[in-house]
């Protein structure tokens, strides 16, 4: 098995072809041999019967002593006919030879048992013969006609060889044609292998499936899809690395500055405590940024959701509002939940949908002024998170949800990734997210399906 796996496809197909042809040729030869020998035996048995009946029509009463026909040279051949392959003799009822052909007939032993065909040997000879015994019309004489079995077999072999030899001669030409066809049909695969060998890892150009056999075309299409996914993943990774490096540069620089301030504060405890407080806040911001970067990276690598379940959005929103209640109270913001629909069920990943709702609520609380109200409303085909703040300028609204985008002049710290995470989770669940200014005032996010 290991040896055949190391062989090329062309060699394996050629070997299979040769094996199949050899088996077919052997079976055909065997069948042809059996059919030919049966036909030859039937033909020659018929000739022996006719010959014996001709002899029985002679006037055998004139035979008084053993006689023989005119002697002919041994094995006189006319074409492919051996004249000593056929012999006859006539015996009396008591086994006395009365007439023979002057050649092999005189060596036929008298072994009459009944009329019909029988096999036997000539005197002092090891070659098997086919004999036909026949009684004369008056029953006084025994006529025997014989033919050598080797002659029949040689005749059958000659007929079979004449039939199969052209096929045997044509076999090398068939093999040559097969090799040429295999070379032509496998040429697209060679080109495909060469294209893969010299393909750049960053290339997004699809493989050319022109001329590729239909059995291999699904493989080429699957490879093209794989290359497209790999290219998209590499683009995302590059963008993620670039964005992460850019966004982490500022917090890390701020941490370095606060560390230096703490070191330079000397014996001033107020300056040192202030610097350490700001350092702690900076570490929190950097930690939050790293967490969001890792979350977004994991979401980008997902194509299909795992561990999905049927989720009640009513329970999901209630749980999210309860979780955000204390941070909202500390910010002097009231969060209200209104259920305009019940028993709204969606299939999804529970943790991701919880993260989506939590990010929307966290964004609303972080950017709403104190004393604001955040309304969460569930409908049959959507849910809305809306605050009653000043809203967002139209020129800024078009950029909301982009990665690392933060409106200018913001006093609240953030990374600009929260709403990007929301949009990605919604996409994975077949939902759409829209951001805009509410008619009653304030900013709202609508998640619909």
From Swiss-Prot:
Phosphohistidine PTM positions read 246
Q: Name one GO biological process term.
A: phosphorelay signal transduction system
What's the superkingdom here?
Bacteria
Instruction: Specify the HAMP domain's residue ranges.
Output: 183-235
How is it placed in the membrane, per its record?
Answer: Multi-pass membrane protein
Which segments sit on the Periplasmic face? 34-161
Which stretches of this protein does UniProt put in the Cytoplasmic compartment?
1-12, 183-449
Q: Which residues cross the membrane?
A: 13-33, 162-182
Which terms are listed as keywords in the entry? Answer: ATP-binding, Cell inner membrane, Cell membrane, Kinase, Membrane, Nucleotide-binding, Phosphoprotein, Transferase, Transmembrane, Transmembrane helix, Two-component regulatory system
Q: Where in the cell is it found?
A: Cell inner membrane
Q: What is its EC number?
A: 2.7.13.3
- Gene Ontology MF terms in the entry: ATP binding; phosphorelay sensor kinase activity
Domain annotation Histidine kinase: ranges: 243-449
Please indicate if the UniProt record lists Nucleotide-binding as a keyword: yes
Work out whether the entry's keyword set contains Kinase. yes
UniProt-listed PROSITE patterns: HAMP, HIS_KIN
The enzyme's first-digit EC class, named in words, is transferase
What InterPro entries does the database record attribute to this sequence?
HAMP_dom, HATPase_C_sf, His_kinase_dom, HisK_dim/P_dom, HisK_dim/P_sf, Sig_transdc_His_kin-like_C, TCS_sensor_his_kinase
Gene Ontology CC annotation, any one: plasma membrane
Tell me the function of this protein: Member of a two-component regulatory system QseB/QseC. Activates the flagella regulon by activating transcription of FlhDC. May activate QseB by phosphorylation.
Q: Which PANTHER family match?
A: SENSOR HISTIDINE KINASE YKOH, SENSOR PROTEIN QSEC
Q: What is this protein called?
A: Sensor protein QseC
Q: What gene is behind this protein?
A: qseC
């Amino acid at each position: 098995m290991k040896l055949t796996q190391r062989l090329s496809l062309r060699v394996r197909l050629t070997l299979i072809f040769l094996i199949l042809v050899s088996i077919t040729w052997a079976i055909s030869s065997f069948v042809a041999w059996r059919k030919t020998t049966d036909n030859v035996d039937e033909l020659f048995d018929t000739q022996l019967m006719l010959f014996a009946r001709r002899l029985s029509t002679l006037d055998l009463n004139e035979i008084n002593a053993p006689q023989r026909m005119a002697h002919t040279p041994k094995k006189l051949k006319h074409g492919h006919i051996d004249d000593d392959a056929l012999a006859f003799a006539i015996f009396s009822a008591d086994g006395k030879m009365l007439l023979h052909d002057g050649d092999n007939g005189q060596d036929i032993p008298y072994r009459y048992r009944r009329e019909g065909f029988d096999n036997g040997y000539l005197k002092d000879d090891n070659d098997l013969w086919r004999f036909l015994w026949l009684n004369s019309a008056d029953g006084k004489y025994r006529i025997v006609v014989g033919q050598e079995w080797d002659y029949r077999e040689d005749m059958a072999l000659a007929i079979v060889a004449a039939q199969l030899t052209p096929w045997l001669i044509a076999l090398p030409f068939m093999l040559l044609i097969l090799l040429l066809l295999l070379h032509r049909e496998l040429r697209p695969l060679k080109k495909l292998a060469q294209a893969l060998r010299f393909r750049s890892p960053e290339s997004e150009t699809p493989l050319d499936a022109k001329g590729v056999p239909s059995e291999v075309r699904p493989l080429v299409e699957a490879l093209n899809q794989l290359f497209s996914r790999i290219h998209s993943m590499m683009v995302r990774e590059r963008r993620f690395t670039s964005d992460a490096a850019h966004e982490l540069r500022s917090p890390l620089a701020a941490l370095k500055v606060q560390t230096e301030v703490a070191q330079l504060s000397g014996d001033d405890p107020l300056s040192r405590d202030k610097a350490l407080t700001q350092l702690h806040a900076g570490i929190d911001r950097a930690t939050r940024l790293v967490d969001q970067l890792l979350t977004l990276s994991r979401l980008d690598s997902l194509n299909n959701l795992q561990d999905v379940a049927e989720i009640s959005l009513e329970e999901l929103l209630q749980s999210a509002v309860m979780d955000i209640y204390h941070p909202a109270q500390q910010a002097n913001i009231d969060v209200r939940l209104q259920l305009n629909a019940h028993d709204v069920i969606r299939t999804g990943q529970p943790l991701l949908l919880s993260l989506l709702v939590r990010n929307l609520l966290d964004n609303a609380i972080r950017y709403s002024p104190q004393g604001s109200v955040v309304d969460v409303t569930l409908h049959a085909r959507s849910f809305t998170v809306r605050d009653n703040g000043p809203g967002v300028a139209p020129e800024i609204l078009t950029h909301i949800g982009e990665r690392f985008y933060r409106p200018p002049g913001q006093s609240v710290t953030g990374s600009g990734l929260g709403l990007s995470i929301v949009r990605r989770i919604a996409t994975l669940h077949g939902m759409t997210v829209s951001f805009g200014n509410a008619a009653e005032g304030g900013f709202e996010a609508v998640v619909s399906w």
